[in-house]
A protein has these predicted regions:
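Feature targets compositionally biased, intrinsically disordered low-complexity regions
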Residues: 179-181, 186, 231, 236-237, ...
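Charged, amphipathic alpha-helical linker segments immediately N-terminal to NTP-binding catalytic cores
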Residues: 1, 209-237
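Conserved P-loop NTPase
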Residues: 160-220, 422-425
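P-loop NTPase catalytic phosphate-binding loop
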Residues: 1-159, 234-343, 347-414
Length: 425
């Protein structure tokens, strides 16, 4: 009887086999065997199925948090992010990351090469966090030494080329062409058990009364302001605008830490919705602490703003230029004079009034002449309570970033959000 001990030799397993050698079937058996003898409270599985889809049936098991196929790129990356989270915050429950089709991840220019480094980190640190990785690949050469050397447990099914064997080339040549036949780490012949859909159904019946493992968290298709507010508290001092990151936690912009905010993306990607959410957050601040100056050439925010918080609104080139000049006049009065002490500069108490948030939507439609008066004030923005919140289309951004205004904003290292955009830009 062949037994794989995931509490020895680093806790991970690599399985290699050629076409039709039974790699996917082996993974089904490993998951099913572990699930049969363990409760969902004790063990859970995340499955990345880049093979022929034979692992999809595992999703029926109460132990399985999620199964992602090759066409589900976002779900695949969410699985990797969620499992990586257990490395940072270990749990008593054991977690298995099952990957079928490593040749779609490991080699250079592979379809999912971007997740290879994260998986390598999981393998490197997983043993101390009750996280195990099981990988099936078509050739050992698809696994870079950085990850292959970390996986001591190895099984070989029949390979396409016996010369590729890491266990025994001569024994590889003698293996019959039958799914499940292979070599153990010690060079002994083996036959892996076959797991049918009926077997999986039996395991489901055995654990019918068990509490299922928590399911994989995914981003919603639509996030309303109400859903965002109910999602969870934003970091202290932050203005919430979405959810994301490895933990799908509330994302927020902190104007005190990063006074300026820039969003870039293709047309229709949601930049204006993003600005609307940021302005809703600003509007929740006390009126004596914040006021909005809104440049809105497309009138996307007309009638949606809290008028008590709006100091100025401009929807044309001429009005934009006029309101920016008026704003600059107000802010110039806050510039520190020669008699300001270091203590006053740190406390910012030589002037009184709200911080001014200049919000520019579709900045590509606003002329450089209109924005030019702000340039001289940008280096003093922290001292005078000036915040720039800008959205611009990605087309032509390469040139725009070297223009006077955007160059000055870029030098201040603003918080930056990149939406869908042309890679060449």
């Amino acid at each position: 009887q062949l037994v794989i001990d995931f509490h020895q030799h680093g806790g991970h397993l690599a399985l290699c086999g050629g076409p039709q050698s039974g790699k996917s079937g082996a993974l089904r058996t490993i998951v099913s065997s572990l699930a049969l003898n363990r409760r969902p409270e004790d063990i859970r599985f995340y499955v990345i199925d880049l093979g022929g889809g034979q692992l999809a049936a595992l999703d029926r098991l109460p132990h399985v948090a999620g199964v992602a196929g090759r066409e589900e790129g976002e779900k695949i990356r969410r699985i990797v992010d969620e499992v990586a989270g257990f490395i940072r915050r270990p749990e008593s429950r054991e977690t298995f990351l099952i990957i079928d089709g490593w040749h779609h991840i490991g080699p250079s220019n592979a379809e999912f090469e971007d997740i290879a480094e994260s998986i390598t980190d999981i393998v490197a640190d997983g043993a101390s966090a009750n996280v195990h990785v099981v990988i099936a690949t078509s050739r050992w050469t698809t696994m870079r030494p950085a990850i292959r050397d970390l996986i001591a447990n190895r099984l070989e099914l029949r390979l396409g080329e016996a010369l590729d064997s890491l266990i025994d080339r001569k024994l590889q040549q003698k293996l019959p062409s039958a799914p499940g036949r292979g070599l153990t780490q010690a060079g002994e012949n083996m036959l892996l058990a076959h797991t049918s859909n009926q077997d999986i159904a039996h395991i489901c019946r055995v654990h019918a009364n068990a509490v299922p493992a928590p399911q994989l968290k995914m981003l919603p298709a639509v996030l309303t302001p109400e859903a965002l507010a109910a999602h969870g508290e934003a970091p202290t001092g932050g203005i919430p605008w979405g959810i994301g990151g490895r933990d799908l936690s509330t994302l927020a912009w902190n104007p005190e830490r990063e006074p300026h905010l820039v969003a870039i993306g293709a047309q229709g990607c949601g930049k204006s919705n993003f600005l609307a959410q940021v302005m809703r957050g600003i509007s929740r601040l006390p009126r004596e602490a914040a006021r909005l100056v809104v440049i809105d050439q497309r009138r996307a925010h007309l009638g949606t703003l809290d008028q008590d918080m709006v100091a100025a609104y401009a929807a044309t080139q001429s009005s934009a230029q006029e309101e920016i000049v008026n704003t600059v006049r107000t802010l110039e009065q806050r510039l520190p004079g020669p008699d300001i002490t270091p203590e006053q500069l740190a406390a910012r108490d030589w002037w009184a009034g709200p911080d001014i948030y200049v919000v520019v939507d579709d900045a590509d439609l606003v002329s450089d002449i209109a924005l030019a008066p702000l340039i001289d004030l940008l280096p003093h923005a922290r001292d005078i309570g000036l915040h720039m919140v800008i959205a611009r289309k990605s087309g032509g951004i390469g040139r725009a970033l070297f223009g006077q205004f955007f160059s000055a904003v870029r030098d201040l290292q603003p918080a930056f959000l990149l939406f869908d955009a042309d890679r060449d830009e």
